């Protein structure tokens, strides 16, 4: 079986632009949640979010391209550029037909839809942008990355709500394993902090309403959690066949060893209460990686800060790991970033790889009130030095989609 390693990483997040800044903030337990500034949220139940601060797309992308991209694509392009640059991919030692792209989004160009709908109503159909459709479709980021670099290998997108990033990376991993590509650029990107997007989540009663103290709002596994905090960002990695990476002396961050996925088949938004869906995906990922539960040293939990999700995921971890569940550090970086929806998997895999590299587990901040039904070691409030050889990263999405990755220190 062909082995697959990570040779590049790129991240745009509410706690830092670029891997270096993200890493520093991650281990310091930096809060990235604040009042919404993208629009006036004064009439909303939830008025807080994990926004990417001071993001100016014109600093990174040509002006003409910026005007033809939704924000979710802009974020994804910047993350991909960092990942490709750090992987040191050059034209000289790579056939573009062997390089593919799989970068997904859970929502796509929602901001563009809202803007163009307003133009339609106010000025008529003739004034709607001819770039509306390519700006809103979820596969456009994959396409634009390929166009920019000339990568002509496998190219598509995945959209499985909050499991999108993990599904994208997992499928890219399998594409390389079976020999359909040598290198895949994979991950997720999202920018859904828009009037309509936030209104929809508010109507579902899914979001935290801790508006007066936004820095305390995202509190996974805490007894006082009251919903997730919407965020935005992008996480993109470069996956590469091991021998190919070694041949060109590429930097190696870690090895992807397992991928598992499943479907709750239960409810459109709520996870099944006993966690059997994510449990099935975790077991499949371990089986795929040929790893026993006792070998896992860290779990980057989905941990959304919602009453249902955190309880179900905790139960699933107990079912999979038995007594070992109480000995494994389990943390949710959403406590710092908020919930990045389709970008979550990519950003959290990067967090897991940084934990492997540095031997430091990022904390779950705002963990103050233990919940009897969430009683694992959630690495409360402060990062911890831990020898990590194998890590697991969980993602769960609306619709009951579950995707789990297992990564190994290289």
Feature locations, PLM:
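Acyl-CoA/ACP chain-elongation machinery
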Residues: 180-226, 259-273, 303-310, 327-377
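Glycine-/small-residue-rich "gating" segment that lines the acyl/pantetheine channel
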Residues: 122-129, 170, 174, 191-247, ...
């Amino acid at each position: 079986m062909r082995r697959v390693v990570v040779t590049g990483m790129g991240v745009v997040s509410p706690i830092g632009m670029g891997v270096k800044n993200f890493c520093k903030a991650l281990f310091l337990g930096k809060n990235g949640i604040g009042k919404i500034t993208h629009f006036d949220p004064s009439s909303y139940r939830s008025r807080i979010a994990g926004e990417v601060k001071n993001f100016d797309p014109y600093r990174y992308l040509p002006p003409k391209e910026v005007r033809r991209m939704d924000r979710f694509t802009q974020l994804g392009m910047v993350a991909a550029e960092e990942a490709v640059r750090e992987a040191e991919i050059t034209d000289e030692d790579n056939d573009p037909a062997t390089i593919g792209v799989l970068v997904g989004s859970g929502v796509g160009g929602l901001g563009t839809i809202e803007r163009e709908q307003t133009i339609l109503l106010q000025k008529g159909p003739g004034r709607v942008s001819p770039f509306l459709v390519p700006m809103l479709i979820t596969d456009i980021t994959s396409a634009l990355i390929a166009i920019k670099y000339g990568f002509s290998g496998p190219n598509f997108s995945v959209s499985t709500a909050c499991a999108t990033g993990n599904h994208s990376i997992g499928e890219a991993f399998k594409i390389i394993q079976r020999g359909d590509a040598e290198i895949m650029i994979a991950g997720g990107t999202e920018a859904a902090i828009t009037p309509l997007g936030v209104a929809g989540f508010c109507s579902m009663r899914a979001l935290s309403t801790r508006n007066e103290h936004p820095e305390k709002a995202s509190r996974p596994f805490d007894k006082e959690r009251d919903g997730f905090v919407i965020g935005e960002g992008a996480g993109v990695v470069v996956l590469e066949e091991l021998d190919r990476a070694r041949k060109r002396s590429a930097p190696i961050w870690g090895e992807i060893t397992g991928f598992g996925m499943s479907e709750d088949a239960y409810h459109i938004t709520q996870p099944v209460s006993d966690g059997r869906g994510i449990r099935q995906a975790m077991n499949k990922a371990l089986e795929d990686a040929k790893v026993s539960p006792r070998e896992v040293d860290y779990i980057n939990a989905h941990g959304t800060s919602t009453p249902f999700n955190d309880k179900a995921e905790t139960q699933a971890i107990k079912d999979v790991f038995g007594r070992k569940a109480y000995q494994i550090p389990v943390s949710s970086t959403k406590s710092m970033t908020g919930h990045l929806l389709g970008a979550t998997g990519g950003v959290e895999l990067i967090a897991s790889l940084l934990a492997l590299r540095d031997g430091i587990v990022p904390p779950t901040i705002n963990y103050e009130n233990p919940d009897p039904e969430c009683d694992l070691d959630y690495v409360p409030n402060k990062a911890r030095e831990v020898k990590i050889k194998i890590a697991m990263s969980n993602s769960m999405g609306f619709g009951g989609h579950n995707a789990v990755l297992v990564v190994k220190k290289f």
